């Protein structure tokens, strides 16, 4: 569901801190957490040959060739809520799939893998990625840092869910 009706668009919320003001938006996010939420929209082009087995070996080729980021755009909170409402109300079951990415994921990778998951599941519902900065390194100390960041990010995830719920005053809300 895209702003213009295409099938590969998703919304995102992240509590990653900007590392840079230069370059594409998806490349500016680092691995530091902050309480300020950033909202946005992204769209991808997925190669028709892409299959489920390719996620197992998510090489750089897979990341960059099979799933291409077409557009990554930041939205103000109010615009994000309006877009989420439009997506949800336009879906057959007035639903939203929330994908939480973090551990050992850089932001561009989380965008691509979320799009891939949406594509493979083919559930005909809009998708929201909540991404926290879990790429803290692969050693034990990195795992421990990632765990602390994940625990602290729970408050931002809760705020995100409340924002979606309050922005969509539908009669039915199911959490599983």
Label every model-predicted segment.
Residues 1-128, 136-140, 164-167:
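Flexible, membrane-associating and regulatory peripheral segments of lipid-active enzymes
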Residues 144-168:
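Alpha/beta-hydrolase active-site loop
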């Amino acid at each position: 569901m895209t702003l213009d009706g295409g099938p590969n668009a998703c919304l995102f919320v992240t509590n990653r801190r900007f590392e840079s003001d230069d370059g594409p938006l998806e490349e500016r996010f680092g691995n530091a957490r902050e309480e300020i939420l950033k909202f946005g929209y992204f769209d991808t082009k997925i190669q028709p040959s892409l299959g489920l087995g390719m996620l197992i070996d998510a090489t750089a080729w897979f990341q960059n060739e099979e799933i291409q980021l077409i557009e990554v755009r930041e939205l103000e909170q109010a615009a994000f809520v309006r877009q989420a409402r439009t997506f949800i109300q336009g879906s057959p079951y007035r639903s939203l799939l929330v994908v939480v990415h973090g551990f050992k994921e850089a932001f561009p990778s989380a965008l691509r893998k979320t799009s891939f998951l949406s594509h493979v599941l083919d559930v005909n519902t809009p998708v929201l990625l909540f991404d926290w900065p879990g790429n803290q390194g692969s050693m034990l100390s990195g795992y421990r840092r990632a765990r602390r960041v994940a625990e602290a990010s729970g408050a931002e995830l809760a705020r995100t869910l409340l924002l979606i719920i309050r922005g969509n005053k539908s009669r039915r809300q199911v959490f599983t």
